[in-house]
Swiss-Prot record:
Lineage, top ranks: Archaea, Thermoproteota, Thermoprotei, Thermoproteales, Thermoproteaceae
Primary gene name: eif2b
SUPFAM superfamilies associated with the record: Translation initiation factor 2 beta, aIF2beta, N-terminal domain (SSF100966), Zinc-binding domain of translation initiation factor 2 beta (SSF75689)
Signal peptide: none
UniProt cross-references to Pfam families, sorted A to Z: eIF-5_eIF-2B
Superkingdom: Archaea
Family affiliation: Belongs to the eIF-2-beta/eIF-5 family.
GO molecular function annotations of the record: translation initiation factor activity
InterPro entries in alphabetical order: IF2/IF5 (IPR045196), TIF2_bsu_arc (IPR004458), Transl_init_fac_IF2/IF5_dom (IPR002735), Transl_init_fac_IF2/IF5_N (IPR016189), Transl_init_fac_IF2/IF5_Zn-bd (IPR016190)
Primary role: eIF-2 functions in the early steps of protein synthesis by forming a ternary complex with GTP and initiator tRNA.
Quaternary structure and partners: Heterotrimer composed of an alpha, a beta and a gamma chain.
Protein name: Translation initiation factor 2 subunit beta
Alphabetic keyword roster: Initiation factor, Protein biosynthesis
Amino acid sequence: MDKEYLALLERAYTLVAPKAQRRTEIPKIQVENMPRKTIIPNFGAIAKRLNRDIYFMAKFFQKELAVPGTVEGDVFTLHGEKSPKVVEAVYERFIRYYVVCPVCNSIDTELRKEGRVFVMKCLACGASTPVKPL
């Protein structure tokens, strides 16, 4: 009986653990500097992984960095040279404000607009938290 239980428990851990690990991984941002431009080639993949609208993320970056930008497919281009450290700091701020659940610290959240307010709903613990508007 104990061996059977341990075998089933081990099987359950092998099935569940990979999914739990994926939820906690925050993708790294890639920043490329060109003359008078800053390009983020993996912007679309990041938006998809974080379960956020790519244009919502782009609007946040444009407001925080005070430069215009364009989204072409999965690539986001800022029209102005910005240091990779500055762009990474803005990315971390976006994650803190609009991705991480303040109750359980999970990144498995979704952003909804309820009336005129954005609400972050955690899919892990079920908490709903209003977030500041853009």
